[in-house]
Amino acid sequence: MAAPGRPSPLAERLRGAWQHRGALALALWPLSLLYGVLTALRRALYRTGLLRSERLPVPVIVVGNVIAGGAGKTPVTLAVVRHLQARGWRPGVISRGYGRATADCREVLPASSAAEVGDEPLLIARASGAPVFVARRRAQAGRALLAAHPATNILVCDDGLQHLALARDLEVCVFNDEGAGNGWLLPAGPLREPWPRAVDLVLHAGSPPGGGAPQFALSRELAAHAVNASGQHLPLEQLQGEPLHALAAIARPHDFFAMLHARGLQPESEEALPDHYDFSSWKRPPDKRLRLICTEKDAVKLWPAHPDALAVPLALRIPPAFFDTLDARLASLSSSGH
């Protein structure tokens, strides 16, 4: 089991290898060559029309990444949806619904469970109020959403840069602070596909990853408050010195713990769990003094059994120029008659 608040030793070693072209990465490089051939072949099949991409009747924005692991794309999706709403658009969100126990196409409602629809789509639905549908085939989710909510005039796809079966009008690629790593494809590097590649906008938490698309720096920090299951806010400063058990089932749990520390909180214990962890069998620490504090994504799964858990929202700082560029691209789509 991983040390509290840290990834497993194997995950740490692989992640370290992805940042450098060392011995482990070199040993895995032949597999990356094979992966690259398969990736290129798949793209060629779509480019030549042997495999078809389905185009939906409204503009589609895909927010995703080209690296394995967490890049923070879902918070960006939520920020894009809120921006579109503020600009008068009526957005809907489609997603695969990774980690859910179901396999059908279905709507994500505020009362849905994460087991039915996935933790990230449920978080988006509750936080934005936008209609959300999940399906393995994103185009199917889009068709179902537009049929159920015909006023929707734009779709945002949470993840799916590599899901070429869905035609898209704009692509937003998100990078965490590790960027493109050593620049190699899986498994010798973190890349799901070669980078740079053509996208419309890039958001990066670290150094600019290169490529020809407009690039914008983003920063992440925790909000200054926690939220309980009833939606009540509690200033984090009131939790300083209190006995806390912090837990995170995200791709990079140590980032959450570090951000808690930056807000002045020092949990007595920290528990790192796999991304999209199913909390149905999770055992609460026996120490009754400890208050649970977690991410928003984990809270949608924890609250049914542990309504006293506190969730700390993530606050993104995205430059206004990013949204200005997004608006300009959407305006050009409208003028071209999409």
From Swiss-Prot:
One Gene Ontology term, aspect cellular component: plasma membrane
Q: What is its EC number?
A: 2.7.1.130
Q: Tell me yes or no: is Manganese among this UniProt entry's keywords.
A: no
Record key words, sorted: ATP-binding, Kinase, Lipid A biosynthesis, Lipid biosynthesis, Lipid metabolism, Nucleotide-binding, Transferase
What pathway does the annotation place this protein in? Glycolipid biosynthesis; lipid IV(A) biosynthesis; lipid IV(A) from (3R)-3-hydroxytetradecanoyl-[acyl-carrier-protein] and UDP-N-acetyl-alpha-D-glucosamine: step 6/6
Where, by residue number, does ATP bind?
Answer: 67-74
A GO molecular-function term, please?
ATP binding
Listed under GO biological process in this entry are: lipid A biosynthetic process; lipopolysaccharide core region biosynthetic process
The reactions it catalyses are:
a lipid A disaccharide + ATP = a lipid IVA + ADP + H(+)
**What is one Pfam family matched by this protein?**
LpxK
Output the PANTHER family linked to this UniProt entry: TETRAACYLDISACCHARIDE 4'-KINASE (PTHR42724), TETRAACYLDISACCHARIDE 4'-KINASE, MITOCHONDRIAL-RELATED (PTHR42724:SF1)
| NCBIfam families in the record | lpxK (TIGR00682)
Question: What is the protein named?
Answer: Tetraacyldisaccharide 4'-kinase
